[in-house]
């Protein structure tokens, strides 16, 4: 190829771009004002034995970058600039020949700059017919991309991976919830016995001036048990006067848009209460609040101050959960599908708020814990609503018909399947897209399970420091509001139980009175409000609901149910402990290879939101083996749905 061979000082623009296409192929000037004879490359004759491709090329756009203004280059004289500006830049097209054996193109004609082989291979569209042929015959083959194939595999594998973590967290939440109704009453009895012994020893040493025991103070774990019992009992008494039926009809009378706003407000209030309540209860159960001298007034003032704040939180959070249950009950019992559609659309909006954001592993762990807690809360709400609707159905049913039939079960359970099914679908879709956009492998959820297993095993190994049980420690990390859920369950269950008992007693009295008036063999007739006669067979009354109510009514029945609940709690806790120990041993073996796990937790944890993320857990979660290679995304290759910053817009 030809090149400029003029001596003297080179142009400033050309000295900066000596390797550029412009400085190599455009004409250059000397400072003396004479044109430099540009060397035009000689036309090489193509080999006729080799096939060639002739492509017409347009004028290069790089010719426009050659500036000749004297104001920009003051060293040049006016004559030099004028002579340079006189040189025309032709728009004629040249023909480039490509040979199979020669990598450099041969330029013929008046050519401003050489072009690459890729640019030369593109056909110039000269008329409309060529454009049509180009559109119809263009090659639309997409090159293979292993990263996108991996994205699709991870997207499809995410639901199975998250369900294993969600299922473990859900069972831990059930174990923590059953703990309050089974083992916690036994711990309270032990705490009362310990308190009585401490009081007796104190009185004995006071009156007889003897030191019967070197340590007469109540252990901190027993104080926490008594405080929990006092909080649950006080909250249940304060919310007892709330008329749930009246609240139900007030919410049901609202318009759909108000109902939608109310549901969102309650959901936000629930999360805020969870974030604040855990800190409040931790302050109340802390060592410096409970460890003070009995005769110290300042210690008592601090204790009552935090107890009042904790009680206010318990009442507020219980009311929020109660309103959520009533709102969900209105949705389930609504004859219009619009309300249920609003509820499901509210769950789908959750995808928009979470998917198009950048997630670190710590944030994904917090989101996973939040979803586990939300799923468990929905389970408790569904059970409460089902029992409530069952009591209403038992109140309005006739005596000669069974309480539960296939048709009634379908009517009762169909809305719950819609609610729970939509929740599962939203969780799967949300986490799958988060995994895709943030270049994370689904194996990260296995590490989340390892973190929860570590908490369970570590709390069980340190029995002297654990005051709330193994499952309670895991529930505390996940942010599960166990005490407010227990309070709202007690409040609704007591009302449902009273409805069952009163309805059953009323039906028995009606059957006896009608049987006395109309004695016909085994059949007794009573009249419904709609004046339709029905036959009631007293000999066949022993249905499952009647048998259950007769058993539970006595003290022996209550003791039997309590024993069954304790056995269920112990079996579930033992199964969870076996799973966590096996995973913990394998986790230690895995982490010893990569040296990314420390076995002892630090005393001061770092809180982010209401889910705990300390430095050790953060280092454990940030493991490079769970990452996918993140390609660099310059502006020319940036795609619409690629996570480049903190959010996808």
UniProtKB/Swiss-Prot annotation:
<feature type="compositionally biased region" description="Basic and acidic residues">
    <location>
        <begin position="28"/>
        <end position="43"/>
    </location>
</feature>
<keyword id="KW-1133">Transmembrane helix</keyword>
<feature type="transmembrane region" description="Helical; Name=6">
    <location>
        <begin position="558"/>
        <end position="578"/>
    </location>
</feature>
<comment type="similarity">
    <text>Belongs to the TAPT1 family.</text>
</comment>
<dbReference type="GO" id="GO:0005783">
    <property type="term" value="C:endoplasmic reticulum"/>
</dbReference>
<feature type="glycosylation site" description="N-linked (GlcNAc...) asparagine">
    <location>
        <position position="215"/>
    </location>
</feature>
<keyword id="KW-0256">Endoplasmic reticulum</keyword>
<feature type="topological domain" description="Cytoplasmic">
    <location>
        <begin position="579"/>
        <end position="649"/>
    </location>
</feature>
<comment type="function">
    <text>May be involved in membrane protein folding.</text>
</comment>
<feature type="transmembrane region" description="Helical; Name=4">
    <location>
        <begin position="415"/>
        <end position="435"/>
    </location>
</feature>
<feature type="transmembrane region" description="Helical; Name=2">
    <location>
        <begin position="303"/>
        <end position="323"/>
    </location>
</feature>
<dbReference type="GO" id="GO:0005789">
    <property type="term" value="C:endoplasmic reticulum membrane"/>
</dbReference>
<feature type="modified residue" description="Phosphoserine">
    <location>
        <position position="94"/>
    </location>
</feature>
<dbReference type="InterPro" id="IPR008010">
    <property type="entry name" value="Tatp1"/>
</dbReference>
<feature type="transmembrane region" description="Helical; Name=1">
    <location>
        <begin position="166"/>
        <end position="186"/>
    </location>
</feature>
<dbReference type="Pfam" id="PF05346">
    <property type="entry name" value="DUF747"/>
</dbReference>
<keyword id="KW-0812">Transmembrane</keyword>
<keyword id="KW-0325">Glycoprotein</keyword>
<feature type="transmembrane region" description="Helical; Name=5">
    <location>
        <begin position="480"/>
        <end position="500"/>
    </location>
</feature>
<dbReference type="GO" id="GO:0034975">
    <property type="term" value="P:protein folding in endoplasmic reticulum"/>
</dbReference>
<protein>
    <recommendedName>
        <fullName>Endoplasmic reticulum membrane protein 65</fullName>
    </recommendedName>
</protein>
<dbReference type="GO" id="GO:0005794">
    <property type="term" value="C:Golgi apparatus"/>
</dbReference>
<feature type="topological domain" description="Cytoplasmic">
    <location>
        <begin position="436"/>
        <end position="479"/>
    </location>
</feature>
<feature type="topological domain" description="Lumenal">
    <location>
        <begin position="388"/>
        <end position="414"/>
    </location>
</feature>
<feature type="topological domain" description="Cytoplasmic">
    <location>
        <begin position="324"/>
        <end position="366"/>
    </location>
</feature>
<feature type="region of interest" description="Disordered">
    <location>
        <begin position="1"/>
        <end position="55"/>
    </location>
</feature>
<keyword id="KW-0597">Phosphoprotein</keyword>
<comment type="subunit">
    <text>Interacts with slp1.</text>
</comment>
<feature type="transmembrane region" description="Helical; Name=3">
    <location>
        <begin position="367"/>
        <end position="387"/>
    </location>
</feature>
<feature type="topological domain" description="Cytoplasmic">
    <location>
        <begin position="1"/>
        <end position="165"/>
    </location>
</feature>
<feature type="topological domain" description="Lumenal">
    <location>
        <begin position="501"/>
        <end position="557"/>
    </location>
</feature>
<keyword id="KW-0472">Membrane</keyword>
<feature type="topological domain" description="Lumenal">
    <location>
        <begin position="187"/>
        <end position="302"/>
    </location>
</feature>
